[in-house]
Amino acid sequence: MKKNAFLLVLFMTLISCGRGYHELPFGGMNGKVEKVTEYHIMPGIWFAGFKGTDVMYMNATAYDINGNEICSAVMDSIGRIQAEAENFFENDVCVRSTQRAGGRTLAQINFKERKGNELVYDKIAGSQITRMIVKETSFLRIFKSTVSEDGEKKMKKIIRINRHGYPVSVDVYDLKAATSSHEQNTFDENNNLIEKYIVRKDATGEETLEIVYVQYVEFDEQGNWTEACTYNKNKLPVEVIRREIEYWH
């Protein structure tokens, strides 16, 4: 995993660990979800009727009884783990997160203390320990977070949410690499994502646009979708996503 990409993963984890902006419990799904497994499937084979033999890769996410994301993993088509993150919570505050890939630990972040609107962490990567600070500010439904490493600002994120708590826009800036991304989300009346616009800017200022449309096909008795198809900006199918959802009893 590239260093900047890994820092972004850590950044997302740190933001979710803070007390300012919180992702919705259970990933915004209905009910007390314990685990979700997503199967990403090639649409051509799926639509042809050959279901079950066409998985490209899989994602799995587990939640504790309070809805905190305690584990997530990316797997290949037969379920072998390629990368994973494990989070530990105390009183709904993330105190430790470990990132692994290829069977080895890439880094671990440990919560040290809170100083006003700053969260202080130690990042351990191999024999190197880096002091990371997350500074949070908020106004109405806008949440801003900045991550610094040993005093140098690395990443910045701005999230705008709707009245239900879902992110309608997300801006991420890699301050060292001079790259950024802007994401605009549209939700239906049941708060399911139906359109996503992403503009990415590289260090030269060149922009690329990605548009994703989502069509939902099946839902379970809790009202959570279990099958969906995504389309690109040309309205061509990209993948089918099938979800298996397990609930706490």
Whereabouts are the PLM-identified features?
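Sec-dependent N-terminal signal peptides
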Residues: 4-14
